[in-house]
Regions:
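Secondary-structure boundary motif
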Residues: 2-4, 66, 85, 145
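Conserved nucleotide-sugar donor-binding catalytic segment
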Residues: 12, 26, 30-112
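Conserved donor NDP-sugar-binding/catalytic core segment of glycosyltransferases
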Residues: 1-25
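C-terminal subregions of glycosyltransferases and related glycan-biosynthesis enzymes
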Residues: 3, 43, 71-73, 78, ...
């Protein structure tokens, strides 16, 4: 469907299960943000790609040099950014894997327990998201070292400098 030279990342949804493999949520995407990203402007601010259900082609793999100057927040997120900046990010709305949620997971599916903790201590949530914004901006700066289109460059520059606006 797509020429080989087009960088592609294809990903799917996951079912969230507990430690005993009981289904907790039929869709991880719907527990996270209720949408799956396919565009750069979405992916800059939020990653919806989980590496275990992602497939990439050689054209996308070749874009990742391993010589990035800025820290990568998450490898699957960076690959999704590359796909949206240079090719296609494709979502298939079908769970293809069980995501086992442990009670001590740091990342992963959002649970009621995590949400209650955030309501009780909003300052911790604020600090966490502030750090996430700064880290995602740092990660996105790597794209500016690559030959992106002028339109894509403008989107990325606006994103990485948005906190600098007085």
């Amino acid at each position: 469907k797509h020429p080989q030279e087009v960088p592609l990342l294809v990903y799917t949804d996951l079912k969230v299960v507990d430690e005993n493999l009981n289904v907790q949520h039929e869709s991880m995407i719907r527990t996270q943000s209720d949408h799956a990203n396919t565009e750069l402007i979405q992916e800059l601010t939020e990653n919806t790609v989980t590496g275990g259900v992602a497939m990439i082609n050689h054209a996308l793999a070749d874009l990742w040099t391993g010589q990035e100057k800025h820290a990568l927040l998450m490898h699957d997120w960076y690959l999704a950014l590359l796909a949206t900046a240079f090719g296609k990010l494709i979502y298939i709305d079908q769970p293809t894997e069980l995501y086992r949620q442990h009670s001590s997971n740091v990342l992963g599916a959002r649970t009621l327990r995590k949400r209650v903790k955030n309501w009780i201590r909003p300052h911790v949530l604020f600090a966490k998201y502030w750090n996430l914004i700064e880290s995602s901006q740092e990660q996105a700066k790597n794209l500016l070292d690559l030959p992106v289109s002028s339109q894509t460059k403008e989107i990325i520059e606006n994103f990485v400098t948005i906190m600098d606006v007085p």
